[in-house]
Amino acid sequence: MYTQGNPKLWTGRLDSETDPKQFRHFQTVKFANLENMENVSDKTGVGLLGYAVDKGVENNKGRIGSRKGPDIIKHEFAKLPDLSECEMLIDYGNVEHTSNHLRETQQEMARLSAKVIKQHKQAFLIGGGHDIAYAQYLATREVYSDASIGIINIDAHFDTRPDEPPTSGTMFREILDNDENVDYLVLGLAQGGNTRALYDYAKDNNIIYVYADELLHQVSPTIKDKIERFIHDHDTIMFTICMDVIDSAFAPGVSSPSVLGLYPHSVFEISKRVILSDKVSSISIAETNPDYDVDNRTSKLAANLIHHFLV
C-alpha cells in the first residue's frame, strides 16, 4: 500500500526563515503523490521513497522492526543542513506491506520507484528490509530495459540464498538466475556470515566480492580500480547499502548486527567512488531497525549517508 509523505517528520532546528544559507532539509523539502506524477523529459533534483516493510526480514528469521526505518531516517535527515543547493527535494512517502505476499509489495514498490528514477537525478529508496533491492532491480530494468546492469552492494552478506518464499536474503539470486545482463559486486563481505554453498554460487555466477577486512583502514588502489572498472563495464549502476555491513559499535540498530563490520568512514569512502558516476540510477539503504538502535545512532548514520551523497 502506498502512503504519501508525512510533513510531521520534517522538523528541526530553525536558524533562519529567510536566509537559504542557514536552511536545513526540513525547510526545503516538498511533498508529492507518485500516483499523480506525469512523465518528464529532464531529470532534476532528488526523490525519496520509503519501503516500510520488514516481511522479508521476518521470512529470513531476522529481527523485525526495520519497517520503521524510513520514517526515522527521514526525520534525522530533515535536521541536517542544506549544503548541496539541491534544486528539488521531494518526499514521496512510503510503500507498506498490506498484501498477502511479499512479492506483491515488491512489485508495487518497483512500479513507484521507476517513476522516481525517471523523474530525478538521484532516487533514494529507503528501507525497510534489504528485499527492497529486488524492487529496486525491477524498477531499474523497467527504466533501462536493454541496459547491462551492474549491482554494487555494500553488505556483509551475499544475499543469494535459494529459499522460498522470498526473503531479505534471496533477492540477488533471484535477479542473477533470471537476468543474464546483470553482474554483481559485493563490498564488505563478512567471512563469518556466508556458507560454503553461497561461495560456490558466487564462483559459478562470477560474483565479484571484497572482504570487510580488506576495507577496514584505507581503500586500496586495487579495490578502487576494481570498483571503477565494474562501473565502466556496465550501462547503468544499481547501488545498494545494507546497514548491517557497518560494525555494531556504530550501527547497533540493524536486523543482523556485525561484530567485525566496517567503519562508517570506509563506507563513505567506497560510496563516494560509486556516487560520482552518472551511471548510478538509484541508491537504496536497507536494514535500519529502530527497535534495536541506541540514541538513534544507526538512523542518524543512514541519514548522513543520504546527506553526503547529494550532488
UniProtKB/Swiss-Prot annotation:
Q: Which reaction does it catalyse?
A: N-formimidoyl-L-glutamate + H2O = formamide + L-glutamate
Binding site residues for Mn(2+) 1: 130, 155, 159, 242
Name the residues that bind Mn(2+) 2. 155, 157, 242, 244
Q: Which pathway does it take part in?
A: Amino-acid degradation; L-histidine degradation into L-glutamate; L-glutamate from N-formimidoyl-L-glutamate (hydrolase route): step 1/1
Among Pfam families, the record links this protein to:
Arginase
Cofactor stoichiometry and binding remark = Binds 2 manganese ions per subunit.
The answer on whether this UniProt entry bears the keyword Manganese reads yes
What is an example of a GO molecular function annotated in this UniProt entry?
Answer: manganese ion binding
Is Manganese one of the keywords UniProt gives this record?
yes
Q: Which InterPro entries match?
A: HutG, Ureohydrolase, Ureohydrolase_dom_sf
Task: Identify which top EC class this enzyme belongs to.
Answer: hydrolase
- Protein keywords: Histidine metabolism, Hydrolase, Manganese, Metal-binding
Give the cofactors, semicolon-separated: Mn(2+)
EC id? 3.5.3.8
Q: Record's HAMAP family?
A: Formimidoylglutam
> Which protein family is named in the record?
Belongs to the arginase family.
UniProt function note: Catalyzes the conversion of N-formimidoyl-L-glutamate to L-glutamate and formamide.
Q: What is the name listed in the Swiss-Prot or TrEMBL entry for this protein? A: Formimidoylglutamase
Organism of origin is: Staphylococcus haemolyticus (strain JCSC1435)
